[in-house]
């Protein structure tokens, strides 16, 4: 009982924090805005940047360019060698990371307040004067090719690759963000420089910060170091993806003790009026861990899997509903049948009042736990800003969830959970699996 009251107190404390989350929008150049939550409890600052320049814009024949560029930016810049650059970061407790998704080129900066000037100077060097020495390029190429080679042996990586090939055939999202092995050796220094010069443009930049930094300070740094990225060049765009999903089962036969199962169907956009209905529905169906319907039916009642899950996934150019499970080869047919059955049940009958109440309670009370550090707050600000939402989202978010009704869930389920538009991918050696497409 004591633990319960401690937990309840913590939830209420965080709830008050969420309500008081004061998000400032700073207009620092033309139409560019940064979001900031000032928190001077600790002398720490977290800043997140995102350019719309992920691996999805990699040119044909140079797949992996965005990722390789990100990997090389801290491998020497200005007059610093790779070793010297990393040492000055470490000596001053500065974390500076570059990485990419299919849609975005991310920069994470985490530093003590007293080292803000130095942090931005080093970030500026990395973005404007990377050395791109041949020795470092070749080393990073070797690392990337090794990871890609190993990915063809790992069942999880195989599943992800084949899943993308089915869902995103003939689209840039089809490829791993690391690229394609045969393209890696084709990438030269001039390609890396061209990527930076042509794609990291302020028109496609999002910025979010949390910690011991004031509005005027953040604006000063952004104007000083990022206005120069107003290069007015035409940035490569990822094409829209249109995929008609059919009711199919794909099999990649592999001699494994267990089979991996992935499935996917129609998704929903972030600005759809029924997005929160889909969000709550997914939690009840397969996003709620041990409390979801899929876990109850497939694991708890029948003991067929260790875990089973579902989620809503969003790319800039495509949205989909997906999920997966792992089970013994002899139980694959059973698991697929149960998953399909549960999707149909929610589509036809919806969910119960109790399920809806429990889902709302969890989704509301757990949200604040995702905002318990400057890094997490900055990440949440960045993602919310990139979703095209306003700074008052954090005040309204819980109301959006509370407003979801049983009828709303039935309506959105009828759109998303169409058994005729969901495919399954199995990797393993399943028994008695019929009507399959081998890949």
Tell me what each language-model feature is.
Residues 4-15:
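Sec-dependent N-terminal signal peptides
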Residues 18-20:
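Boundary at the C-terminal end of the N-terminal hydrophobic targeting segment
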Residues 24-30, 250-254:
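Short acidic-hydrophobic surface loop/beta-edge motif
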Residues 27-53:
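N-terminal targeting signals for Sec/Tat export/insertion, comprising classic cleavable signal peptides
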Residues 39-41, 48-50, 234-291:
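His/Glu-based metal-binding/catalytic segments typifying zinc-dependent metallopeptidases
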Residues 48-110, 153, 288-304:
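M16/MPP (pitrilysin/insulinase) zinc-metallopeptidase core fold and M16-derived inactive scaffolds
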Residues 84-234, 251, 301-302, 306-439:
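Charge-rich, well-structured scaffold segments of protease-associated domains
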